[in-house]
Amino acid sequence: MADNLRTFATACQGGLVINQDPLTQGGQFAGTATRMINYEPALNGGYRRISGFTNTYGEVTGEADTPVLGVHVSADINDGIFAARKPASGNNYIHKWNNSTESWDAITTSGSPTMVGVSKVRFENFNWGTPKFAMVDGVNPASTWDGTTYTQLNGGQAPSAPSLVAAFNNHLFLAGDSSEPYNLYFSAPVDETDWTPASGAGVINVGFNIVQLKAFRNELFIFGANNIKRLVGNNIADFVLQTVTNNLGCVAPDSVVEFNGDIIFLAPDGIRPVSGTDRIGDIELATLSKPIQSIFEDYTANEDLAAITTVVVKKKSQFRFFFANQDSLGIIGAVRRSGQGGAGFEFSQLVGMEVNCAASGYIGDEEYVIHGDGSGYVYRQEVGNNFNNNPIFSLFKTPFFYMDDPELRKTYYSINTYMRAEGEVSVSMAVDYDYGDPDTEVSTDYGLSTAGAAAYYDKATYDATDIYDGNPSPVESTNIAGSAKSIAIRYVTNSTDPSHTIQAITITYGLGDRR
């Protein structure tokens, strides 16, 4: 019997893949997943159950039962965390977090802005000598905050109700006014309050309804639903509008983010980058999300793409797409760098987070990832082991492994799961055979449990909550008994346990016959 035993081994990498046939995926891409929810590509290899979020910032002052309209991180202004919500009375819709009192302080506005009809407030940081950020909402004139003074931008030819804002080459750009959706306005140089042509301000008709603006290096990209253009130059004297494409556009305004040295956006056929190639002035557009293409077809049919919220988690080389409904499946996209110096995109899905708006940024050397919900509360992500005291559901299912021969029956004896745990963790493991054939017996669930994570001394202080390494034994062994041509494994949790990472899998099996 021992001479007949074989070992199948695969490292967990490649992420969620649903565009391959079963034989190709189970052979060439064995480390990928056919289902993956609330796992993320781990920095140390494998798939990690995501961290939780907590209501660090409580409820933003405002009218009862109204959503958070926008959140923002600006490290150099006040304590760095800001949120917008419709006020119960008056006009003070923007609030700053006070670290000392652990409460929200209303910012006194001017110009009588209203939040009636506002669905989202967008922000843009800039610094032309003093750190500030601009705000737009599609109902009121744009405004700025410098930590002391709220200023409406309603002079000269400034648009009355822009919904889009970008800072580019010492000018503030505004667009998205529903009364003139094709116009792109820019301020005078180094003066966001001056919108007079004599000072160098101006307006450009781009020829299509503007969906989003994004400055990137020495270019300002202007997205439409079916077009993309870019603006180059330094001021009104040499600004030039150039066409990128007239056959492709952006379907979700808040999907446009800078990520991994590029701009990415959601197009009708999935996630795309706007990438400069080696040829000067050339632009390359390629779909990044081919492995999960059918998911975006489902989104087009069942979700409001205009309501997508995107946030970047820089320390993990990761972006996240959210929908406001916590039962909707969002997307994690991440860059996985290989030991050979290469890199590729991997994807997973998210569920269980109600995200009406989100933002991220560094305050000091610490990254803050925050979001606001539909009831006025602001949360910090990447904190803790639960979703605001609720358990985190996670699911990872492998492809069906057929060990080089899909027609040869095997007898399966054991599964070794190489797992790093960040504390005491229980994971339910189940086995499926022969592509879910109802005539093949399905195994019962198996329980994996770690004995707890190791701790270490940090700055001469013993801290049992810090993690030095995974569970003392990185291998969880499970004896199984089954006979089939192929086998797939599912890992499921629904708990408040610490996170764990599934890094690799081995299966011990024996060769059978063909029948």
State where each predicted segment sits.
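Surface-exposed ligand/attachment interfaces on beta-rich extracellular proteins
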Residues: 62-65, 152-162, 203-206, 212
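Carboxylate/His-rich catalytic cores and anion/metal-binding grooves
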Residues: 160-191
